[in-house]
Amino acid sequence: MFRANPLYIGDSATDMQTAKNPGLLAVGVTWGFRSAEELTSSGADALVNTPADLLPLFERGLLAVDAICKAFTKRGFGFTYFPTVADALPYLTDTCAGKSVSLGGSMTLKELGFPEAFSNSTAVHWHWVRTGEFFQTPDIYLSSANALSETGEVVNIDGACNRIAGTLFGPKRCIFVCGINKLCPDLESAIDRARNVAAPLNAKRLKKKTPCAVDGKCHDCQSPDRICRAMAIHMGPPQSMERCEIVLIGQPLGY
């Protein structure tokens, strides 16, 4: 599901145009001379924020958005792709304007600037502040995911389980906001990413006393601090929701 076209990597508008002239795929690096917005407007097909983020592109190429969109939409999910955070923010803030919104704990959402990015017309609730009817039945539940499969599944692991609960039942609409680093070839690799990439990073961030926080891999431990208490795999939208969608952003975000 990835293109085999050669990549042209650069850090300027001239580089992006140089790539486009012979029909190459342009990858903009954001640690150079130009901002993400300038690179995108100059024709960048993808952006990377660190040198380490280049490795998946070397191994697999740029994602074929149309194929991934089809994988999710044939399962009934909504799907929208934005090249950059700056492109995605207006869609998210406009969608949530005038609505009640609950947010799941997410490094991706924090990197996007939420909840501060919302307008004053949006009633926002962080799910760890208080529980109750507002959290359970908002107009929109905004979350991220530990992994997305290119075959159209969404994978999340949770400790308190209030985050995955909000993606399964109660809200009228659920939006998963994810960076390209969350994409995996299939369901098996998506589960592996959730267990051996996202969970260890979160355990370390939260200073949990678990083996994965030390060596970065899942031991299926029984530690009291274990944050892998439940796993949710969305194979399609919950029947009770009006809409469940994926917003994919062409930049690495979160864990």
Segments (PLM) and residue ranges:
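Acidic, Mg2+-coordinating phosphoryl-transfer loop and its flanking beta/alpha structural elements
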Residues: 8-48
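Conserved phosphate- and dinucleotide-binding cores of soluble alpha/beta proteins
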Residues: 140-255
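Short, structured coil segments at secondary-structure junctions
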Residues: 22, 42-43, 75, 121, ...
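Short, well-ordered alpha-helix to beta-strand connector turns
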Residues: 23, 44, 98-99, 138, ...
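Short acidic capping loops at alpha-helix termini that bridge into adjacent secondary structure
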Residues: 2-7
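N-terminal active-site beta-alpha-beta segment that forms phosphate/nucleotide-binding
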Residues: 65-142
